[in-house]
Structures are given as structure tokens and as C-alpha cells.
Regions:
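Phosphate-handling DNA/RNA-contact segment within nucleic-acid enzymes
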Residues: 14-104
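Generic structural signal for bulky hydrophobic/aromatic residues embedded
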Residues: 1-2, 31, 81, 151
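Contiguous hydrophobic segments
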Residues: 7-26, 45-57, 128-160
């Protein structure tokens, strides 16, 4: 999903079984010790479902800001894009955990929302803004995309395409100069 080694320390490879089938996936831990799991074929959770909270590059007592995401792939995309961000990263892991999310957001004075650009994301955003009117919605950054990860993927694709075009132009110029 366009992620780089910057975020690997936030993940763990989890091995699990569904019936007789043995699988593995990247895992992102939640605050109850459960895991959100993703691989090419599977999206689910292991043990208890809950929100995930990661404290990045700061002393939580001094820095009370948080960024909020629906899923952990979007959170990892944010960390990829902003590796020096200082604050909390809260991942809902399911919109059904909205009330749990709102309860946890009471610990922060500065809230930044990066929720999906779909109906459930809109509902969550409106509910959080109703409870925390000072929260800031940042979905305009990726307004043409479903979520922050899709935005990152399209940005990376554009960079790769430009690089390939430059390489092709260089090769063509090299060939022409040899003639």
C-alpha cells in the first residue's frame, strides 16, 4: 500500500490460522492487546477489537495533540508523509468504536481528523466535530481520494511516472547523441 521502512517499527508480522489454513499478515496493536491484521487477502482482527493509540516523538504530558484515522493503513500513510510529527496517533479500527474514540479524545486539546471521504467517514467526522467543535478536519487535503492512503499511492504513482518519463527522455537523448 505504498509504505516504506519509516513505519515498520509500528508493525509486527502476525501468524494465525483460519480453520486449517495458516496465514500471516502485518499487525497493528490496539490498546487492549489485540491486533488489526492486513494482508493481500485478509482484513480482520485478532483477539479483542479496540482503538489503537501510538505516541510519536514526544512527551504526552507536554504535547496534547492527536491525529485521528479510521484505519491503520491511513495512519501509517500519515507517519510516512510526516515522519517528524510529534503527538498522538489514534486509529478507530472500526466506525463502531466511535464512542470509544470520543471518550479517548477527551485526553487531547488539539484534534486533527483524517477520516475517509465516504458516508461512514462523514458521519464519524460530524459526530466528533459535534463533541469537539475545535477539532480540525483535514479531508480537503485528499478530497479527490477515498482516504489518505489512496492519496499517498496516487502521489507516489505520479512521482514514479515522472521519474520514468525523465529516464526515458534521458535514454532517448543518449541514443540521439550516439548517432
Amino acid at each position: 500500500r505504498g509504505l516504506w521502512p519509516t513505519v515498520y517499527s509500528l508493525l509486527k508480522e502476525e501468524h494465525f490460522a483460519i480453520g486449517e489454513k495458516k496465514l500471516y499478515a502485518i499487525g497493528f496493536e490496539n490498546i487492549s492487546g489485540g491486533w488489526e491484521l492486513r494482508n493481500q487477502f485478509y482484513k480482520g482482527s485478532l483477539l479483542k477489537k479496540d482503538i489503537s493509540v501510538v505516541n510519536l516523538n514526544n512527551n504526552l504530558e507536554k504535547n496534547k495533540n492527536v491525529v485521528v484515522f479510521e484505519g491503520f493503513i491511513d495512519a501509517l500513510s500519515f507517519v510516512e508523509m510526516k515522519p517528524f510529527f510529534r503527538g498522538g496517533v489514534l486509529v478507530m479500527n472500526s466506525i463502531s468504536l466511535l464512542n470509544r474514540t470520543k471518550e479517548h479524545l477527551k485526553n487531547y486539546s488539539e484534534i486533527h481528523l483524517f477520516l475517509d471521504n465516504d458516508k461512514p467517514g462523514e458521519i464519524c467526522k460530524n459526530e466528533i466535530l459535534k463533541s469537539f467543535p475545535e477539532a480540525k478536519d483535514h479531508s480537503e487535503i485528499y478530497a479527490l481520494h477515498k482516504d489518505l492512503n489512496d492519496y499517498l499511492l496516487s502521489k507516489n504513482k505520479t512521482k514514479i511516472e515522472k521519474q520514468q518519463q525523465q529516464e526515458q527522455k534521458f535514454k532517448q537523448e543518449q541514443q540521439e547523441s550516439e548517432i
